[in-house]
């Protein structure tokens, strides 16, 4: 059994839930905001300097967080497009793509491991849907790419592997997390997703 299976996935939690977690640890709630901001900057728990060792030990006894690792990275010599193959904690892999435009950097992220939609033009449907990505794994693609690039990502399109609305609850949580002002602060107007179930048109989500 994976040692994280019975622990709380902190990166999937919104700030009020993390505040409740710290309250249960007997720690002040302001620690939650410190941890939230650090996680969303891609900082490991060990590297956080404003949380004590004793508090970190209490956190790791009950919870965890981590980010996808880069298994492969390809950079286009033509337009600077970056293609990432990210490996998740369970060994599954998903793809993300960085695209550079005059208005900023856009990342295309995956929402599932595999896909059950069966679109003939898409190779990710061959083996069907393996599983949904957790909010932390959706967010983790953006954080890992931001950390690797050393630049701010200003736009997100959810048009990678998987069907976003087939993973509705986790995607909605992700949208709230990625737009939080203490996190990456990418507003809804800068996020688009594809809906292959019906029209295959992009739909933007506004506050």
Predicted regions and their residues:
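Single conserved hydrophobic/aromatic residue that forms the stacking wall/gate
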Residues: 197, 201-207
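Flexible, acidic/Gly-rich N-terminal and inter-domain linker regions that tether
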Residues: 1-105
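Conserved alpha-helical substructure of the radical SAM core
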Residues: 126-155
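Conserved, mostly hydrophobic/aromatic
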Residues: 115, 156, 193
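Alpha-helical scaffolding segments of alpha/beta enzyme cores, especially the outer helices
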Residues: 140, 144, 170-177
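Canonical Radical SAM [4Fe-4S] cluster-binding loop centered on the CxxxCxxC motif
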Residues: 100-137
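Glycine-rich beta-strand-to-loop/alpha-helix junction loops that act as flexible
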Residues: 159-162, 194-196
């Amino acid at each position: 059994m994976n040692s994280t299976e019975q622990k709380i996935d902190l990166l999937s939690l919104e700030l009020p839930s993390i505040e409740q977690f710290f309250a249960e640890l007997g720690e002040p709630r302001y620690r939650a905001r410190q941890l939230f901001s650090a996680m969303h900057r891609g900082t490991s728990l060990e590297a956080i300097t404003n949380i004590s060792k004793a508090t970190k030990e209490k956190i790791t006894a009950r919870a965890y967080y981590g980010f996808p690792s880069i298994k492969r990275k390809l950079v286009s010599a033509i337009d600077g497009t970056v293609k990432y193959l990210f490996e998740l904690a369970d060994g599954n892999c998903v793809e993300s793509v960085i695209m550079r435009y005059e208005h900023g950097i856009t990342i295309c992220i995956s929402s599932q491991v595999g896909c059950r939609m069966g679109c003939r033009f898409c190779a990710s449907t061959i083996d069907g849907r393996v599983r949904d990505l957790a909010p932390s794994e959706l967010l983790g693609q953006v954080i890992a790419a931001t950390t690797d690039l050393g630049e701010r990502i200003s736009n997100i399109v959810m048009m990678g592997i998987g069907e976003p609305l087939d993973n509705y609850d986790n995607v909605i949580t992700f949208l709230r997390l990625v737009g939080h002002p203490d996190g990456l602060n990418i507003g809804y107007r800068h996020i688009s997703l594809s809906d292959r179930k019906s029209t295959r048109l992009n739909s933007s989500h506004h506050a």
